Amino acid sequence: MPPVPIYVKGGVWTNVEDQILKAAVQKYGTHQWSKVASLLQKKTARQSELRWNEYLNPKLNFTEFSKEEDAQLLDLARELPNQWRTIADMMARPAQVCVERYNRLLESEDSGGAALSTGVTDLKAGDINPNAETQMARPDNGDLEDEEKEMLAEARARLLNTQGKKATRKIRERMLEESKRIAELQKRRELKQAGINVAIKKPKKKYGTDIDYNEDIVYEQAPMPGIYDTSTEDRQIKKKFEQFERKVNRKGLDGNKDKPSKKNKDKKRKHDENEHVEKAALGESTTLTDEYKKPKLILSAPGTKQGKVTYKKKLESKRQKLIEAQATGTVLTPKELLPHDSGQEDNERSNIKSGKQLKSRIRKFLVQMFASLPSPKNDFEIVLSEDEKEEDAEIAEYEKEFENERAMNEEDNFIEPPSQNDAPRVSLVAVPLAYSTLPIPEFKNNPQSAIDNKYNLLVANAINKEPHMVPEDTVDFLKEVESRMQHITQGRTSMKIQFKTAMPPTEVLLESIQSKVESIEQLQRKLQHVQPLEQQNNEMCSTLCHHSLPALIEGQRKYYADYYAYRQEIRSLEGRRKRLQAMLNSSSSI
């Protein structure tokens, strides 16, 4: 029998052990170190935990200490002596690194800047070191040893196994139950074919509240009874359900109703052949009568083609509607002056002209709306590109062209008034528009003048359906203007203005001015008496706000605190009195 190897757990960590430890921590976490150590043959649970917390944890900081961190380390070592775990957590560094850095700082101060001790990184792999968990891992030497291969294979098998023994047993039991159920169904089917009807055995219930999904309806809630009697309908439904079950048990679920029998097929085929032979003997053609039915003869209406209006008729009707719409004219144009018979060229020319005018109006309206927008509130300058500058120039040119075109249109559209002898009598009644009321425009968001304010006032009155009332002073002023205009005589000579009201004499004016001056001086003297009162009032307010109110609040707070202490003392004295009374009563009873 070969000797059993004895492992002394500990020593330098290898690269394979570090990788196994990382994978085990990912699966088992940082609280089940006994399970983690079971994957490592030469390491204990304590050593695995120290290795993770001192070297492998990705949260640890292994960079060089800065001056601020050195100062913080010295302060913490002075405040928390020999509590290196706590200091390491606060510094986010391993405890051994903090100890070595602290010793190095002390030795450098004692020796004048030369460090004498060796740190963790100064030791070589393989040297005897009690703090092997803080050392670097030993690199792999080519091929792995047999022990390392065995340890790695076992760790891989255990870490890759996501199902434990209990889960595997549950899966095996579930598969066994499924196979039993399938065998039971097969046996019942064979017995039923042999004429023996065997009912399905109900499974045993572990609890009294278990649900049989083959018999019961899961979580069924019976509907509440209504106001009408439905017992007759229930009996009919139950009877139909029983008939359906008997039919299914006898013929199956689908039945044979959808399958045409062979006898019916043969009878139908023979009947068709006999009918065809009889018609052929009589000389009748079965092509039109048997294959399809002739459609009913429907003649189209006159002026249409196959029951539909022709394309030319549609086009002509639309053209007449357009001509009638264009010949209506404006609202104030008399009917006698409207053109009744015009040629196709005049209509096309007027259509083109009206389309251009409509486009120009829309474009001008858009330009005006963009111009009425408020100026931007940004502070930076907006530099226009060359394309935008060209567009602005085109808009300016377009506005000029539009003004010229409008002037020319006004000259062309001017209609000379007919003579009194030849002109017919024109009705001055305006043709009403298509709608009874005009649409109400929107408010101007940023009114910049009195006209804009007046416009917004008119819009508000229109929305509220209130008449726009002229102020009384304006009405009086207009009446006065009209009365004066009646007395003005127009002539070629210069106009003479006569003042109806005479100016008062100079003495009266001086007396009124003197009286006003005296009243002003009297008011100033009264104000001199008010100024000391104002100053006194300000002083009293400052004293009240800065001294009296804070003192009152402080006294109130102190009173509440003293009163609370007083109440606590009273409660304690009352409890002490009750205890003494109870003691006296007990002693007297004894």
Swiss-Prot record:
Function text: Involved in pre-mRNA splicing and cell cycle control. Required for the binding of the NTC complex (or PRP19-associated complex) components to the spliceosome to mediate conformational rearrangement or to stabilize the structure of the spliceosome after U4 snRNA dissociation, which leads to spliceosome maturation. Its absence leads to an arrest of the cell cycle, possibly due to the inefficient splicing of TUB1.
Cellular compartments per GO CC: cytoplasm; Prp19 complex; spliceosomal complex; U2-type catalytic step 1 spliceosome
Assigned protein family: Belongs to the CEF1 family.
Region entry Disordered, spans: 244-286, 336-355
Main location: cytoplasm
Outcome when changing residue 33 to G: No effect. Slower growth and thermosensitivity. Complete loss of function. Complete loss of function
Entry superkingdom: Eukaryota
Ranges of Basic and acidic residues composition bias in the record: 244-263, 271-281, 337-351
Family matches, as PROSITE patterns: HTH_MYB (PS51294)
Phylogenetic classification of the source organism: Eukaryota, Fungi, Dikarya, Ascomycota, Saccharomycotina
Subcellular location: Cytoplasm; Nucleus
Protein name (record): Pre-mRNA-splicing factor CEF1
Coiled-coil stretches: none
UniProt entry keywords in alphabetical sequence: Cytoplasm, DNA-binding, mRNA processing, mRNA splicing, Nucleus, Repeat, Spliceosome
Organism annotation: Saccharomyces cerevisiae (strain ATCC 204508 / S288c)
